[in-house]
Amino acid sequence: ELWLPAQHFRACLNAFTKLSKGIWMQQEIIELYNNQPKTWTAEHKALFNEFLSALNIGKIRSCEKENGIWKVNEWVKMGILIGFRMGELTTYQWGMDKLFFDKDTLPEKQFSLDDKIRIVPGGSSARNGCYISSGVTIMPPAYINIGAYIDSGTLIDSHSLVGSCAQVGKNVHLSAGAIIGGVLEPIGMRPVIIEDDVFVGGNTGIYEGIIVQSKAVIASGTVITASTPIYDSIREKFLEYDTGKSFTIPANAVVVPGSRPMKSNPNFQIACPIIIKYRDNKTDKAVELEQALRK
C-alpha cells in the first residue's frame, strides 16, 4: 500500500493542479485561435487576461530551451495574436497631457518598487505581456514588446528595442541603439535569442531567428540576419543554417562588421559579418569594465 506524508501529498497535488491548468489554458488558446468567434465574450477576455498574467510573471514564454535545444511554443504566439484580434482601439493617457492609442487588450506594463527593476526616467516603455526579471536595468528611452523575456542582471541601454517574443538571457548588455528583432508570424518561426552573458554593441541589429550563444560579443554596428552570410575566420568557413533556418552565433565568438565581393560583380561588396576570434582574457577584461561602469 502506497502512503505519502501529508506535505508530500499536498506538493504533488499542487504540481498536478498547475500542470492541468497549464494544459487547459494551452488547449483553450489553440481552440480560440483556430476558431475565431464572431463576438468576443467575457469568458474569452478572462482567458486572455489569465494568459497575459502568466506571460508577465514568466510562467509561460514563447520560446524555451529543452535539453539544450530552443523550442518555439506556438500556442503562446497564438495567445498573443488573439489579444490583437480581440482588442479594440482605445485612448490611453500618459502623464498629464500625453495621449496614445492602442488595443484595449494590450496596455502599457505597470511596475512597482517590489519588482526590483531599475527604470531610469526619460521615456522607456514596456508592453503588457512581457517578462522582465528583477535586477534588470532599463535606460531611457527603450522599448520592450509583448512576449519578450528578459532575465536577471541584464542592461537595456538607451534607444534599444527588444522585439516581440525575443528572448534575452542573464547578464546581457544591450548597448545604446541595439535592436533585437521580434516575430509573431509565421507562428512557428523562432524569435531572436540572446543567451547569457552576451555583449551586444551599440547600433547593432539582430533579426530573423538568430541565436547568439552565451558569452559571444557582437561588435558595434554589426547587423545579423538569416539572409546575411557569416564567416568564421578562425575555422575558415561560413556558418551553416541551423534547424531554425537561421544562424547560430557560437559561444564566445567575437563578431565584427565585414563585407565580401559580390559573386556577380566583384567590384561591389555586400555585408558579411566576420567572427574574428573567440573570447580571451583581453576581451573579458573589456566586458568586465563595461559591467563595472553600469553598477
Spans of model-derived segments:
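Intrinsically disordered, low-complexity regions enriched in polar/acidic and amide residues
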Residues: A6-Q7, M25
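Cationic, low-complexity basic patches in intrinsically disordered or flexible, solvent-exposed regions
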Residues: L2, H8, L19
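Terminal amphipathic alpha-helical/low-complexity segments used for targeting or macromolecular assembly
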Residues: K21-I117, S246-F247, A251-A253, P257-K295
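Structural signal for interior beta-strand "rungs" in well-ordered beta-sheet cores
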Residues: L113, R118-K263
